[in-house]
Amino acid sequence: MSIVTKSIVNADAEARYLSPGELDRIKAFVTGGAARLRIAETLTGSRETIVKQAGDRLFQKRPDIVSPGGNAYGEEMTATCLRDMDYYLRLVTYGVVSGDVTPIEEIGLVGVREMYRSLGTPIEAVAQSVREMKEVASGLMSSDDAAEASAYFDFVIGKMS
């Protein structure tokens, strides 16, 4: 839920107008909209590059996952790993656009640790894949945009750690 929706829901629940503090938060949200959209456009437009480069970096740092017996061993399992990385990048994009981590958590992180544990997938490798995407994506943006996007990547990483 965006800051705008949250503020309206809270004010309406109390049958009141928006407070000056709520209006200030909404103003900051609206003012930052162009930057959030620019970041989302960069992530969306560069998603194949981000996922591929981050995947290559992950597999260099964690050769165990692409070796025989590893969770990403073989063409099909490597493709599955890259698909999952793309999914988390998409979630980060949702967070950036909304200016909130709620969509990330509600759409895709509930039960993620348990799911990977049940599949025998090392969750630390999944978290590392998100770190690698953060690094690659940050190199495609200004330092201000990278700092904004980093908060959402870090949220995903934190939920996996």
UniProtKB/Swiss-Prot annotation:
Its main location: membrane. InterPro entries: Globin-like_sf (IPR009050), Phycobilisome_asu/bsu (IPR012128), Phycobilisome_asu/bsu_sf (IPR038719). The keyword Electron transport applies. Contains one covalently linked phycocyanobilin chromophore. (2R,3E)-phycocyanobilin binds at residue 81. Light-harvesting photosynthetic bile pigment-protein from the phycobiliprotein complex. Allophycocyanin has a maximum absorption at approximately 650 nanometers. This is Allophycocyanin alpha chain. The lineage of its organism: Bacteria, Bacillati, Cyanobacteriota, Cyanophyceae, Synechococcales.
